[in-house]
């Protein structure tokens, strides 16, 4: 699978509120179980409830696979999906 960074820009304040409300009720275990398929796997999210964009790292076969995994949630955002073939992990 390829690495993708996705900027999910909320289409409205209401959509932003729905996103963060729903996200706050999901455990990491639930996300691990339900945000993965053979074609797309959610890896990590960076978000701030005060901002109109949230960022996600995905491993996926294609941008379409990410949108398919998101399902109806994809409609909350304008999804700017960029393949990132160069990854440098210098984490501690």
Model regions: which residues?
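Conserved short beta-strand edge segments in small beta-sheet-based binding/regulatory domains
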Residues: 75-88
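Short S/T/G/P-rich N-terminal loop/turn motif that feeds into the first structured element of a domain
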Residues: 1-43, 48-52, 61-68, 86-92
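Short, intrinsically disordered, mixed-charge
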Residues: 68-75
């Amino acid at each position: 699978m390829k690495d993708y960074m996705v900027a999910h820009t909320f289409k409205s304040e209401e959509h932003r509120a729905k996103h963060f409300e729903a996200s706050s009720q999901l455990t990491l275990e639930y996300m691990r179980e339900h945000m993965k398929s053979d074609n797309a796997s959610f890896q990590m999210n960076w978000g701030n409830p005060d901002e109109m964009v949230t960022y996600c790292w995905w491993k996926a076969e294609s941008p379409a696979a990410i949108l398919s995994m998101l399902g109806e949630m994809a409609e909350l955002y304008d999804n700017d999906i960029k393949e990132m073939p160069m990854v440098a992990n210098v984490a501690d």
